[in-house]
Amino acid sequence: MKIENIIRRVLRESIQIEELGDGFIEVFIMSGDEVVGDMTLETSDNKHYMVVMATIKEEFKGRGLYKQALLELLRIMPNIIIQSAFRSPEAERAWRSLIKQLPNHIGHRIENILDIEMISIFNK
């Protein structure tokens, strides 16, 4: 197997995406063959996807898998904008860390809407 195919296979294994209908997608966060977390995102326009729920198994927290999953989702779906508004303290730390370490081709925007901080990440 060519190295490019191996790399693509490994990247595909880091997340799996399932369309749930009614504007929702489920992103399964993988470690090898094991589902270690998931995110539910909602869209009304197939462009802006709001994270409405995210979980990671306790033993996998702190490994950056949530941040990796967000970046991988942007790689797979390059024309979307991922948004987060209501974050747990753990998610807040993950988003702050992500913003500090964004690759050069990923942009971000922070807006305050009705006293709620919305963070958006997107491909430039």
Report the location of each language-model feature.
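Conserved beta-hairpin
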Residues: E18-D38
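GNAT/GCN5-related N-acetyltransferase fold signature
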Residues: L41-E42, I56
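Conserved GNAT acetyl-CoA-binding A-motif
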Residues: R75-E90
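Conserved acetyl-CoA binding element of GNAT-fold acetyltransferases
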Residues: K47-E58
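Conserved active-site tyrosine of GNAT-family acetyltransferases
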Residues: W95
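Short acidic, low-complexity intrinsically disordered linear motifs used
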Residues: M1-Q16
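Conserved acetyl-CoA-binding loop-helix of GNAT-fold acetyltransferases
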Residues: I56, G62-R75
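C-terminal "cap" of GNAT-fold acetyltransferases
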Residues: H108-K124
